[in-house]
Amino acid sequence: MKRSKRYQSLCSLIEPKLYSPQEALKLLKKLATAKFVETAEAHIRLNLDPKYTDQQIRATVVLPHGTGKAIRIAVITKQSSHIEGADLVGSDDLCAQIAQSIINFDCLIATPDMMPTLAKLGKILGPRGLMPSPKSGTVTTNVAEAIQAFRRGQIEYRTDKTGIVHLAFGRMDFNEQHLYDNLVAIKESVETNKPSGASGLYWKSFAIATSMSPSIRLNIQQWS
């Protein structure tokens, strides 16, 4: 694929080496030259084969400084028609909207009693990464606590089919320290949630990029 002159110019700023996280974040700031506030992204390649269930990751992490993105939270429950902090609350009516692929939310939380109904909507919610799960904290009886966690900056992540984890860890108008703190939280969470089936070298590569830039590879041994 032919890259733009802008992209090629940014590539020329990146040396063929592994950067310390602090060096990488300083450089990342220089790469954020788009005319909008770009997202800071982490792309982590792990030595996992996700076709095996004991080599899959699906977990959550609370970013100390959040993602910088306002999210719309929907709750599916029969317990109440109004829940503080939720943008949408419903039960069968909200499920009917989802069945028609009407998705007006970024995060979906459900009470356990609604899961049999939601299971039928897996083909719609699954590909969008919106299917509630106990592992992600989105199937719970304590809905208020779950909402607060996501408002504080909790995000869900998982390995894709090739064993890579993709996450947003902030915006490029965050200062370097806040981006670093969020990045450390991600690394620690991925380490803590290492699957039982993982063997040998766990970390294959760890790269960061803006939404419009080439990636910078990190030396994951240099975390201070």
UniProtKB/Swiss-Prot annotation:
GO (cellular component) term, any one: chloroplast
UniProt GO molecular function: rRNA binding; structural constituent of ribosome
Entry keyword annotation includes Transit peptide: no
Pfam family, one: Ribosomal_L1
Keywords for the protein's UniProt record, in alphabetical order: Chloroplast, Plastid, Ribonucleoprotein, Ribosomal protein, RNA-binding, rRNA-binding
Gene3D superfamilies named among the record's database cross-references: 3.30.190.20, 3.40.50.790
Subcellular location(s) per record: Plastid, Chloroplast
Cysteines paired by S-S bonds: none
A GO biological-process term: translation
Family: Belongs to the universal ribosomal protein uL1 family.
Protein name according to UniProt: Large ribosomal subunit protein uL1c
Species annotation: Cyanidioschyzon merolae (strain NIES-3377 / 10D)
Gene name of the encoded protein: rpl1
